């Protein structure tokens, strides 16, 4: 899928680019696989803002995507490739031979009419899902589980791909897109291939209004706030921040500071990601 450019009829139009949507074959979603999606505008259950710069945006319906792929040994035909407003990747509508329907993340080069399946005995081809123990070392994979049966949690965004590096006993070494090498249990499932919509990262929004369509609100610089609102605030005119380094609204290092939390699963990291 390519990037579509526009004639510069307005200043924003000059830089704006969109996806060409050549892969999309169906406009309306499958009614049995959608659910209402209530927007939270960055608020938690107490109504307090926990994620800033969220709110508004176009109304969406949630597409129920199958991340578990436990329907083993039942082939499915790809009926359509669809747009999903809730993620960067496209989704594929599957029609299983037993009549069941499901959505999956659409891998790169998956086409309408292709037949895919899941299970330990599935072939090593794009779109098939197998346990890591049944996937050859060196294979490119996505949609990776962290716990067997929980459903895919890693490598799901557009263009993302991981590589199975090695297997040792009950665990496999998987290199993630960040460069981190992580131990994952060999009974966890993964899908063969790379996530589709590779050109997504090259798209330019081009104007503020397009961010608002996506539900992203403006981010105000701390230096133009008052001292009560931000550590950078206050002063006469364009005053310097008055610190050695920039900080967040809560006083934590804003550039170069570590933000990743310590978790019990950190002992599964073989090699840390790129700095």
Curated annotation (Swiss-Prot):
GO BP: cytoplasmic translation
Location of region: Disordered: 222-243, 256-275
GO cellular component, as recorded: large ribosomal subunit
Gene3D superfamilies, A to Z: 2.30.30.30, Nucleic acid-binding proteins (2.40.50.140), Ribosomal protein L2, domain 3 (4.10.950.10)
One GO MF term attached to the UniProt entry: structural constituent of ribosome
Cross-referenced SMART domains: Ribosomal_L2, Ribosomal_L2_C
Keyword match GTP-binding: no
UniProt key word Transmembrane: no
Entry keywords, A to Z: Ribonucleoprotein, Ribosomal protein, RNA-binding, rRNA-binding
InterPro entries membership: NA-bd_OB-fold, Rib_uL2_dom2, Ribosomal_uL2, Ribosomal_uL2_bac/org-type, Ribosomal_uL2_C, Ribosomal_uL2_CS, Ribosomal_uL2_dom3, Ribosomal_uL2_RNA-bd_dom
Domain of life: Bacteria
Function: One of the primary rRNA binding proteins. Required for association of the 30S and 50S subunits to form the 70S ribosome, for tRNA binding and peptide bond formation. It has been suggested to have peptidyltransferase activity; this is somewhat controversial. Makes several contacts with the 16S rRNA in the 70S ribosome.
Subunit organization: Part of the 50S ribosomal subunit. Forms a bridge to the 30S subunit in the 70S ribosome.
Official protein name in the record: Large ribosomal subunit protein uL2
Source species of the chain: Syntrophomonas wolfei subsp. wolfei (strain DSM 2245B / Goettingen)
Gene: rplB
């Amino acid at each position: 899928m390519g990037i579509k450019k526009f004639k510069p009829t307005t200043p924003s139009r000059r830089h704006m680019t969109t996806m060409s949507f050549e892969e999309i074959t169906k406009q309306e979603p499958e009614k049995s696989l959608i659910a209402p999606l209530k927007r939270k505008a960055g608020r938690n259950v107490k109504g307090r803002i926990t994620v800033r710069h969220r709110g508004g945006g176009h109304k969406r319906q949630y597409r129920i995507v199958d991340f578990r792929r436990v329907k083993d040994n039942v082939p499915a035909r790809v009926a359509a490739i669809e747009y999903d407003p809730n993620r960067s990747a496209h989704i594929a509508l599957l029609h299983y031979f037993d009549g069941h329907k499901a959505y999956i993340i659409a891998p790169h080069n998956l086409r309408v009419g292709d037949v895919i399946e899941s299970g330990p005995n599935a072939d090593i081809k794009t779109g098939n899902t197998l346990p890591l123990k049944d996937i050859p070392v060196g294979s490119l994979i996505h949609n990776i589980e962290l716990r067997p049966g929980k459903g895919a949690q890693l490598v799901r965004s557009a263009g993302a791909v991981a590589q199975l590096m090695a297997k040792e006993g009950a665990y496999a070494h998987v290199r993630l897109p960040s460069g981190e090498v992580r131990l994952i249990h060999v009974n966890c499932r993964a899908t063969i291939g790379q996530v589709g919509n590779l050109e997504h990262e090259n798209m330019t929004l081009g104007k503020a209004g397009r961010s608002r369509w996506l539900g992203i609100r403006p981010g105000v610089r701390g230096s133009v706030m008052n001292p009560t609102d931000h550590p950078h605030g206050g002063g006469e005119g364009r005053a310097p921040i008055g610190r050695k380094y920039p900080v967040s609204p809560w006083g934590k290092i804003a550039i170069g500071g570590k933000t990743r939390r310590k978790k019990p699963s950190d002992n599964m990291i073989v090699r840390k990601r790129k700095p």
